[in-house]
Amino acid sequence: MSRQLLRGTSLQRAANVVAATSSRPMVIQPAHPMEHRSPLQQQQCKLTPSIVIRRWKSFLHNNNSSAQTAAATTAEAATVTVTATPRRSQAETLNARGSHSPFDAPSRCMSTKSQNNMKFVTIDNINANFKAMEYAVRGPIVIRAGEIEKELLKGVKKPFDRVIRANIGDCHAMGQKPLTYLRQLMALTMEPRLLNSPEYPEDMKKRARDLLDACLGGSTGSYTDSAGIEFVRRQVAAFIEKRDGGVPCDYQNIYLTGGASPGIKSVLSLLNCTVDGKTPGVMVPIPQYPLYSASLTEMGMTRVDYFLDEDNCWGLDRKELQRSYNEAKKQCNPRVLVVINPGNPTGQVLTRKNIEEIIKFAYDNKMIIMADEVYQANVYDKNSKFYSFKMVMNEMGGPHRTQELISFLSVSKGYLGECGIRGGYMEVINMCPDVKAVLTKSITAQLCSTTAGQIAVSALVNPPQPGEPSYELYEKEKSAVLGALKERAKLVYDTLSTFEGYTVNPVQGAMYVFPKIEIPAKAVEAAKAKKMHPDVFYAFELLETTGICIVPGSGFGQIPGTYHFRSTILPQTDLLKEMMKKFGVFHTEFMKKYQ
């Protein structure tokens, strides 16, 4: 599924055509995508990444293809799910390639009668929304990167000696070291006998004892309240009040979650209700983080796209919000507005004025705001500042203080980067008490998030304070992480800005750069010949030539006719410099090849 591209349905492509000829582009995802697809497209949707890779390997074995041919073949397979071009017959394929393509309509992907006799659950009788789900940052390009890593271990010769995974915001995987105080706190709570060890500072021991006292039976192996350990929720509330300059925060509005994602999905599920015969619509920024598009497809909700202003450093314009809302009303019931600040994949930090405009728009149109604020500690530009939606909303006063809002934070980002521990929280603000009770009931059915994640949240919101034994080391490690990210943000921007045909906005925050590329017409035609999006074609050639793994912009959404990609700024500085150097050489050769 072509890096899990976001424009895979015929309805989606039709909307893109309309958008490309209009000054007001918008894309609306259907509530039930598979129902709008032709039989051919439905069959193509069954080509999962694992099937793509299995066939690719079989094709390599049978045809003894070169690595470059393998790259092109893999890329073609990756985009089969989104193309409207009719598939060639097997005879035509044999004439064209001299052998069967591993991607022609095969019996393994189809539910044959014999297979139906063997299995009660088949590809034809599972949830169609699950089959239609797409998630760009873990698709076939990343799978191909993993295959290349295995090939390198086996001694297969490549023009590079390692894969640089710039495709995902996984801080520790890219070399960031964990902060000492958090790991000490987790060690002490998971193995209480360490509380007697002189190797651990007393402030961490006290924090560990307080957390253990708040756990049933004094053990992190116990269930917690479904909303999370009350002691930690109170710590979160104190953290929010301090962050927002004293704006009150009730700990009973805090839910501890396994990272931000489960909280986001819980809220979307809560709001998944047909009103007046129309499916619920969720407005998401384009470009957007694929969690939203994947979740909405899974739930059968309608995705309503609003476009960020690339020429204004990916800012947000109220007129664009209203245009998107008005058009969506014809087909669905828009009731949720998603805002990601700082932005993923775009790396922008919204101005206070922008946030005020968003709040006014949501209030006027009776929409709830989902504020994805997981990168709030990642602000690098000296002229940018993070403002929480809650604080701005309260300072606006008047009726806007009653705006319904849910905000999210995670230990996966910021300066901790603890992606695998899965800790986070959401705060629900101005929610109807009856609705909140239903949300709580739903979360109760999930039992609770892990105690490890909840302890990590405690560490995030209650770090060492001045005068405590752990404070000096904490400040040193935190400053080193954020300082290095700021340096890399500038390095990536300065380097990519010199590339021919690149337009790059400064990385104001978050962990990503999202440049626009002018891909030569010859390369676009080469991509079309392989049934590929041009940015996917570019990304695969980059991977096979340099070992650099990025995510094509079509996986996040982009204005039709434009091409982008997302790269993280997370590789350690020396590796990032090497990556930028390789990138520059590749791009120069790519432009020469296709001019």
Please report, for each region that a protein language model flagged, where it lies by residue.
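Short catalytic/ligand-binding loop motif for oxyanion handling, primarily in non-cytosolic enzymes
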Residues: 172-176, 182, 345-348, 365, ...
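Conserved core of the PLP fold type I
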Residues: 189-364, 370, 376-399, 406-407, ...
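Conserved PLP cofactor-binding pocket of PLP-dependent enzymes
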Residues: 132, 141, 163-164, 174, ...
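Conserved core segment of the aminotransferase class I/II
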Residues: 112-119, 123, 181-184, 203-210, ...
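N-terminal mitochondrial targeting presequence
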Residues: 1-121
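Conserved PLP-binding catalytic core of the aspartate aminotransferase-like
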Residues: 124, 173-174, 180, 474-486, ...
